[in-house]
Amino acid sequence: MNKKMTDYVIDLVEVLNKQQKQVFWGIFDAASMISSIIVSYILFYGLINPAPVDYVIYTSLTFLFYQIMIGFWGLNASISRYSKITDFMKIFIGVSVSSVLSYLLCYAFLPLFSVRFIVLFILLSTFLILLPRITWQLIYSRRKKSDGEGEHRRTFLIGAGDGGALFMNSYQHPTSDLELVGILDNDEKKKGQKLGGIPVLGSYDQLPELAKRHQIEKVIVAIPSLDPSEYERILKMCNQLGLKCYKMPKIESVVQGLHPQVGGFQKIDITDLLGRKEIQLDESRLGPEITGKTILVTGAGGSIGSEICRQVSRFNPERVVLLGHGENSIYLIYHELIRSFQGIDYVPVIADIQDYDRLLQVFEQYQPAIVYHAAAHKHVPMMERNPKEAFKNNILGTYNVAKAVDAAKVPKMVMISTDKAVNPPNVMGATKRVAELIVTGFNQRSQSTYCAVRFGNVLGSRGSVIPVFERQIAEGGPVTVTDFRMTRYFMTIPEASRLVIHAGAYAKDGEVFILDMGKPVKIYDLAKKMVLLSGRTENEIPIVEVGIRPGEKLYEELLVSTELVDNQVMDKIFVGKVNVMPLEVINQKIEEFRALQGSELKQAIIGFANETTHIH
């Protein structure tokens, strides 16, 4: 078979789904057993009668038992590029045990055939079943090598615990480009032991010495619970030694389908190096809030809005209304969700939050139980140049959403705010501060419950500092930092989205919720870690200070003193009481803002927002 033909066959089978692969291999295995019984009969007796009933029954029983056994082992959809020697042994055992069981069952009521006949049948069946799998593996391996993927990399695995065992069990197969040389673990008791036949050579503190001795090229970290500071230390050692460093994905991301397999690995990213572990919150109260209900998310196509949609979908709502102004982003999240979750009615709605009548029509039509308001303009320098748009979207848009919630009798609204709303020097933060006042104002007069959630900087969101640094590093630098003293609070997109959903569950009376994000992080330190992650040095990728941009602060705050309350609703979540202003006063201010433009509008909004920070 020439190369083009083998490539065609491989590509053809690779596109089959799991059920189709089960049928494919099931038919092939059945044909192998039928061929084996025929060949065995001819070899023993020199002829074959037309369809002897005892042999038909025997072969059918053997195939049935065999399918049950390999199904139990998870091999009935096995494509051999993932097969291991242990899989081949299981196939041999499956054929042998199935044949013997069938023989014993047939012993009582069918003419017997000799034990030698059974042995020959077992050997022939095993050979014919394994032949295409091994051939497939060799062809696939050859194609990988011809594509430049087949070179084996001498590799250390860090972690001989549960994570290491999972990795070894799911990844170690003959076509891998890894040559696992040894395992490193800081548990002295494990030194000298073996995991999957690979020895534990010592602790990962010995990485420099052992890597040179064994000519290592790659390191894979398989300790899901490893402290971020330890990740950073390992990464620094790898960079100094010129080694590529990877990690296992988190187990929950594998379970949720966000990563293809436990044994896959990915580069360590900046979220591992923020100095704290990702916060997990108690989800026991979330099911009753969401399950079987209609949820509406504004800004559903954005970074936070789309993640809120994913998170609420885990709790099986009846319907999720995806409301957004950008048709492309709504299209993408809609199709992602209908692929990922079954039994949920996803409704894509193109609407502008500046259009109150349209919002009211949507809210009355779908009657959501909760509205998560994530639509907003968020970029500080951009809004400094466009204050009117910040006013229209963040203030008028929020007012329209809150008013429609009240008019449509939606039980609950959760608004996404920002730590930049505290003592804001810029128009973006000021508009979000006014938006907080709007929702707390409505909370005072409406039957609906309103609350706000303040975020720090969200890693990985569109326009955040991480993709900017990545682009600058990819271009060879320099990496630009506005001020080496600048600090920010950081959280991941899943953390931010979970906080929003928890706020909806705990909201009672116009609270503002803030996640405990640990200590603020210096942007300069973040830039240095990003350069480190790239495998480069600061000599190769310089980091330069360019000066604070209009509207930026050196330090962000989470709460002011007048917003503090004594209790926390739950561990890792602070709750504050936003100072309330009557809606009549807010309405009057909004009308004043409508008449202003440019710098006058900007100063008016900033001035009003700061005046309201310390009201009682």
Model features per residue range: what roles?
Residues I350-I370:
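Conserved Rossmann-fold cofactor-binding substructure of NAD(P)-dependent oxidoreductases
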Residues A211, Q215-I216, P317-E318, F363, ...:
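Proline-aspartate-enriched helix->loop->beta-strand connector
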Residues N2-Y8, Y231-T294:
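Flexible, Lys/Arg-rich cytosolic regulatory linkers and terminal tails that connect or flank
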Residues M1-G150, Q240, K247, V371:
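Signature of alpha-helical transmembrane segments in polytopic membrane proteins
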Residues L241, Q256-G257, H373, H377-E436, ...:
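Conserved Rossmann-fold NAD(P)-dependent oxidoreductase catalytic core, especially the SDR/UDP-sugar
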Residues Y45-N49, I139-V255, N328-L332, R339, ...:
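A solvent-exposed beta-alpha-beta segment
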Residues I295-S313:
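N-terminal Rossmann NAD(P)H-binding glycine-rich loop of SDR-like oxidoreductase domains
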Residues K21, Q280, R285-E289, G441-N457, ...:
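Strand-loop microenvironment adjacent to phosphate/nucleotide-handling motifs in alpha/beta enzyme folds
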